[in-house]
Amino acid sequence: DPGSKMQQVAEADHFRLVFFGRPSIGGRYSALSNFGMVPAAAMGLDTKKFLDRSQEMARACGPAVAVEENPGAMLGIILGTAARSGRDKVTIITSPDISDLGAWLEQLLAESTGKVGKGIIPVDREEVGAPEVYGDDRVFAYVHTAHGIDVKQDAKLTALEQAGHAVLRISMGDIYDLGAEFFRWEIATAVAGSIIGINAFNQPDVEASKIATRNLTTAYEKTGSLPAETPVVVDGGIKLFTDEKNAAELALAAGGDKSFAGYLKAHLGRIHVGDYFALLAFIQMDDAHQEILQRIRHAVRDKKHVATCLGFGPRFLHSTGQAYKGGPNSGVFLQVTCDDAVDLAVPGQKYTFGVVKAAQARGDFQVLAERGRRALRVHLHDVDAGLATLAAAVQKVLA
């Protein structure tokens, strides 16, 4: 951004060229600006071809185009009216060659629409299941390239259609149509937001977690430690934390069972029809951790018939984090944190990167609790052993 610290560093170090973004463009809408296109050019993408395709979609979505012929407006009308009728969980399915599109759509939809108690909850990387594991609160958005279709995945989506679920199919010629899809979905999101009754271009609840995090790191700078907290359950290498209101509700639901499994069962028992379950993992995002967390989310979906989300912190704070705190109070959250096997100092500060991560997790949880969300934090001493224990416990309490 013009005038930022990064510009000052670039000029001081005599960078060959500085590309400026437009401060008026929100980050989630900036894929076709310098923020998206400069890296694309650097990696060898044919940017002219890419932007030519994007321009075709921009013209098709222009204000002079009739609504019924406007692909962005029509998609937005579908998403907005579906959300108002209760189908507010947009499940994103892509062909394997464009799988990362889901993460971009997840941020666009969640950060744009999830506010003032309303919103569309995007669901990314949830495997397609049998029709009977879903409730009636879903819209399935299937985006694929012409030559990237997964036959088995396509057959599962056909089964969902035949069972009466809402399935949108969007076919791209090839990956150079991604820019066109960026534009289509940006227009659609704005239109859907208007129908829902929110401003799609602000993110009022993102800053709340930042403030809570800064308060915690400031406390660390003064005292050399984060404020003390008391677990509600200690069970081997696992500790459970939550706020007073959630603790009281969980203790009542658990009855005399004060174990990890007892509280976990009580927490998952708070998931009702129309809710969604979100795993908020402040741990390393690697294949092994993703695999076990995916197993957990699918176990919850298949048993509870609710939408499930999986986000790794702190990155989800700037995407789905907005909807979790500002959107409808229909989420049940399980935050996962762990001790750091290795930590690094932050230059010029007393705190370490591990402390910053812990403060981000605690700060976000604090705001979830302040917003009256159903939330429980699982802290693992050993992340790998702890995840295995957590997965086994989830399977057991859902049985």
Label every PLM stretch briefly.
Residues 202, 207, 224-228, 266-279, ...:
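C-terminal amphipathic alpha-helical interaction region
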